[in-house]
Amino acid sequence: MKLKFDLKKKNGNARRGQLTFERGTVQTPAFMPVGTYGTVKGMTPEEVKETGAEILLGNTFHLWLRPGQEVMKMHGDLHDFMNWQGPILTDSGGFQVFSLGDIRKITEEGVHFRNPVNGDKIFMDAEKSMEIQKDLGSDIVMIFDECTPYPATHAEAKKSMEMSLRWAQRSRDHFDKLENPNNLFGIVQGGVYEDLRDVSVKGLTEIGFDGYAVGGLAVGEPKEDMHRVLEHTCPQLPEDKPRYLMGVGKPEDLVEGVRRGIDMFDCVMPTRNARNGHLFVTGGVIKIRNATHKTDTTPLDPHCDCYTCKNYSKSYLHHLDRCNEILGARLNTIHNLRYYQRLMESIRKAIDEDRFEQFVEEFYARRNREVPPLGKQA
């Protein structure tokens, strides 16, 4: 079904809303854990839900290569395959193709590349991406686009953005031809160039989508550039449609995204960092493998209500990490995912109570950091 987006409240640029799908509701601003291969690494769907997650991100490119469309269709769709009955957003595969580097060739038609799993020559285009995502049963389908690399000259970024716009139209046309009852999001490109972002927004809104993502950020550009692009782009996006900042990011990035009008985020950071022993807490980050934690019998974060913090000490988590025990990665992941969801809950509450900027000040004060400057207000 078509999603319903209710924008309930604004506090400055920060937006408080709700996404309603056939499979459930999602409170925004929202963070989506990443389940690349149909699993949030090391977690059962029940455990992910327990952390407060209401929507997951799946990866079109990787699920197409393994297990493939036929296996997916045998189960029904990705929801049935992985036993997650909440909403799922799938990225189109564009970013993964971008990440392949030398083993891919991008043309107007699409992307030729070698399968990183077995070396086979394969081809992906906008139409194929729409077909795969329909088979996945994605509640939110992303258009096929090219992620503009950083750094890129204005001419390079313009050429890439214009091709992404043509691919956006092809994605829209094929999505409609397939009679997909779900939702299609456009992706704004244009690198760090505001004039190119303007052209991209205009082109995408003329085509018309159910939501709009800001892509091509967090690919190596300075934070100031990311903030500037968001400040410039977000006010131009339709007020009544959800806004999604792709692949971002650190807790600070989520706060800064919300300050500039973003509703949805995804990132591998909480799960990947958990497996590397980098754990997010109220005051910043704890590196659990550091020797100082060997004899620390206190929980990771006294403010955290997750299963890990309620039951285990830093000393135990340090021990598991040093011994490379699988349980260590699992407990760390539970904690980091819950940290991210608690952060989003706090953000939503602050917007509800008209004190979001006060929340921002307190957030940075706990980290002993200055609040980054905020540019023009919408």
Curated annotation (Swiss-Prot):
Its EC number is 2.4.2.29. Substrate binds at D91, S92, G93, G94, F95, D145, Q189, G216. Pathway: tRNA modification; tRNA-queuosine biosynthesis. Zn(2+) binds at C304, C306, C309, H335. One of its GO terms (biological process) is queuosine biosynthetic process. GO terms for cellular component: cytosol. GO terms for molecular function: metal ion binding; tRNA-guanosine(34) queuine transglycosylase activity. Residues 247-253, 271-275 are annotated as: RNA binding. Keywords: Glycosyltransferase, Metal-binding, Queuosine biosynthesis, Transferase, tRNA processing, Zinc. It comes from the Bacteria. Transmembrane segments: none annotated. Gene3D superfamilies: Queuine tRNA-ribosyltransferase-like. Its cofactor is Zn(2+). Binds 1 zinc ion per subunit. It holds the Pfam family TGT. It catalyses: 7-aminomethyl-7-carbaguanine + guanosine(34) in tRNA = 7-aminomethyl-7-carbaguanosine(34) in tRNA + guanine. The active site is at D91 (proton acceptor), D266 (nucleophile). InterPro entries: ArchSynthase1/Queuine_TRR, TGT, TGT-like_sf, tRNA_ribo_trans-like. PANTHER family: QUEUINE TRNA-RIBOSYLTRANSFERASE. HAMAP family: Q_tRNA_Tgt. Belongs to the queuine tRNA-ribosyltransferase family. Homodimer. Within each dimer, one monomer is responsible for RNA recognition and catalysis, while the other monomer binds to the replacement base PreQ1. Catalyzes the base-exchange of a guanine (G) residue with the queuine precursor 7-aminomethyl-7-deazaguanine (PreQ1) at position 34 (anticodon wobble position) in tRNAs with GU(N) anticodons (tRNA-Asp, -Asn, -His and -Tyr). Catalysis occurs through a double-displacement mechanism. The nucleophile active site attacks the C1' of nucleotide 34 to detach the guanine base from the RNA, forming a covalent enzyme-RNA intermediate. The proton acceptor active site deprotonates the incoming PreQ1, allowing a nucleophilic attack on the C1' of the ribose to form the product. This is Queuine tRNA-ribosyltransferase. The gene is tgt.
